[in-house]
Amino acid sequence: MPEIDMKPRSRDVTDGIEATSSRGMLRAVGMGDEDWEKPQIGVASSWNEVTPCNLSLDRLAQGAKEGVHAGGGYPLQFGTISVSDGIAMGHEGMHFSLVSREVIADSVETVMMAERLDGSVLLAGCDKSLPGMLMAAARLDLSSVFLYAGSIAPGWVKLSDGTEKEVTIIDAFEAVGACKAGTMSQEDLTRIEKAICPGEGACGGMYTANTMASVAEALGMSLPGSAAPPSADRRRDYFAHRSGEAVVNLIAKGITARDIMTKEAFENAISVVMAFGGSTNAVLHLLAIAREAEVDLQLSDFNRIADRVPHLGDLKPFGRFVMNDVDRVGGVPVVMKALLDAGLLHGDVMTVTGRTMRENLEAMDLADLDGTVIRKMDDPIHATGGISVLHGSLAPEGAVVKTAGFDLDVFEGPARVFERERAAMDALTEGRISKGDVIVIRYEGPKGGPGMREMLAITGAIKGAGLGKDVLLLTDGRFSGGTTGLCIGHMAPEAVDAGPVAFVRDGDRIRVDIAARTLDLLVDEAELAARREGWAPLPPRYTRGVLAKYAKLVHSAAEGAITG
């Protein structure tokens, strides 16, 4: 076996007389003669002060750097962006959310390639920064470890009628709808506002950030047990230090990201998402990460795995508990062990510890599933996984639904068609949405939006208006991990690409059958052909800047909305 090169790339900037100028610059940032033989490790963080999700990352990056030093490497920290979906929701800012995933992946690749760094510790806290970092790791195929910022603790609110309850950010969106509908006072809305974010950390339910943190651990790209501890918990500092040590160990063993992110590892990640009832955004992100890892992952893989993995997590937005509770009952490893014991995971996949997933779990003192936060395997919430991919005449390339919260097997109703989210929100506010309606929001796809906005504002308003179980919402956009109600997104092809959704008219009958995984427009083909005559999409909303570039490059949601 050939000897492992501990400096597979940084020799370009440290060795020989040609590296004189770069060594001089590296001396200015603290390196010395004793450091030239050490692997250089990029510590990439999406820390910022815009949102509580990322506040722990500056602290954790310092811990990771200490771990790199302890492991025999030399850390070099750099930053990247992060967009807060919670702040960007419901207005123009949401166009930029999914775009930020690509910017993060591209920016990390750019620095890692330009500076010839040998490996990386990647730290993130917000929804799109997690997949962005994992995409970068897969694209670069260097030794890499991912570390999550951790989630926020739930808030506690006492309302004017004396009732008290636990609240998260999602309660605010639903409370806005209730206030507009006249079923909640402005006073109680303000009380909820002040309670939802009691400190640092990502949104606390099994929303997108916690789903993707669980994905990273299930993929083997994060240390075992590192996804669930809260942001403020000092165990995160331990995991930060260990992550820094781990990446140097991976270089010594010659293990790179694609050695870990195999097809079997992606199947493990999907299984964990299904068991938790995680965010539908995981479908989009896993497809994109797999593409970077050169793994052939398809929408059909999600249904295949959902058919055999039960939904076990009684977790918000549809359930009762949050990530802190998952941590309390043993974290992601407890769920992985139960799935492995049931023959539902591949135990021989490699992980960032340098050991297999089975070896990691066997080395941990893990409890059984608690039966409440995470139901027992023989007593699931649903017999199949929490996400389904639908196909049919309205979504030939697919659409995604969170079956974990879909209360009906079949829904059929008349279409109410809106060009973009704002028009639908106005109709709801003005009382023009009725029970039984199928709300169709189009031109919100990856290209047509552009940016495939999340629809949390409208879904929260629908629930707040008391219509959450009585109307169906369809869109070529997507949904927040915190969305509840009868919602189907990621419809492909999207409207701007002449997908069937572009030709739906008010009053058309639409039918969804969850068990059959079908989504159909009940209009005959001759009528649809007539509607296609002379059709043209809405003109581009942006003609310059990052969104204009994105719209020209982005692929279908069925391919993960990738840009490469």
UniProtKB/Swiss-Prot annotation:
One of its GO terms (biological process) is L-valine biosynthetic process. GO terms for molecular function: 2 iron, 2 sulfur cluster binding; dihydroxy-acid dehydratase activity; magnesium ion binding. Its EC number is 4.2.1.9. It is an enzyme of class 4 (lyase). SUPFAM superfamilies: IlvD/EDD N-terminal domain-like (SSF143975), LeuD/IlvD-like (SSF52016). Coiled coil: none annotated. Binds 1 [2Fe-2S] cluster per subunit. This cluster acts as a Lewis acid cofactor. Pathway: Amino-acid biosynthesis; L-isoleucine biosynthesis; L-isoleucine from 2-oxobutanoate: step 3/4; Amino-acid biosynthesis; L-valine biosynthesis; L-valine from pyruvate: step 3/4. Homodimer. Functions in the biosynthesis of branched-chain amino acids. Catalyzes the dehydration of (2R,3R)-2,3-dihydroxy-3-methylpentanoate (2,3-dihydroxy-3-methylvalerate) into 2-oxo-3-methylpentanoate (2-oxo-3-methylvalerate) and of (2R)-2,3-dihydroxy-3-methylbutanoate (2,3-dihydroxyisovalerate) into 2-oxo-3-methylbutanoate (2-oxoisovalerate), the penultimate precursor to L-isoleucine and L-valine, respectively. HAMAP family: IlvD. This is Dihydroxy-acid dehydratase. It comes from Clavibacter sepedonicus (Clavibacter michiganensis subsp. sepedonicus).
